[in-house]
């Protein structure tokens, strides 16, 4: 009788940043610019949308994206321009429990990498603010590569650049589409919801002590 294939151990962790280690949300800014929550949500759903923002994540300059929207929605010109000019106010802070986990992994010598959908223009603001970004052995920023998740090419680029074995790498992200794309390429994956669940998984993988 054939024996089951042994479980391949996890040797490295590849992290998403926003929503996992960093609390980024445009609402942190726009709740100050709108007195009415419904109006704010309508603006984010129909003007400065997630799809529009992802174009900057994929390399489009903010000045180009902003002026495109101002031409379409001149009544919201000030609010649209604030997305660029006051972008730093969308960063509420670090997800401290997740950062603590990252620090424990680092202390144990686990190779750590990041793969993030982030504007190349705005990522220096994150580097200046979050010292823990220096803990990574490598960070791949979508805006610098002009590729964004869940495009399979950006995962393949991470594999090549960081010399990863997907079957030995745990990918952590809060977006289901990104998790699904990584899984198709052979990564072990974890859909991030809260730090305790991530910690439990890392313990079960043998990367953190019980």
Predicted regions, residues:
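Alpha-helix C-cap/termination motif
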Residues: 72, 105-108, 129, 161
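N-terminal helical cap/lid subdomain that shapes the substrate entry/recognition surface
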Residues: 5-100, 107-108, 119
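Short, proline-enriched alpha-helix->beta-strand connector loops that line the catalytic pocket
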Residues: 108-110, 135
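Proline-centered loop/turn at the N-terminus of a beta-strand
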Residues: 111-113, 188
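Residue-level marker of regulatory loop/turn positions in helix-turn-helix DNA-binding domains and
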Residues: 94, 115, 147
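Asp-based, Mg2+/Mn2+-dependent phosphohydrolase catalytic module
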Residues: 2-13, 119-210
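Generic structural signal for small/hydrophobic residues in well-ordered secondary structure
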Residues: 16-19, 59, 105, 114, ...
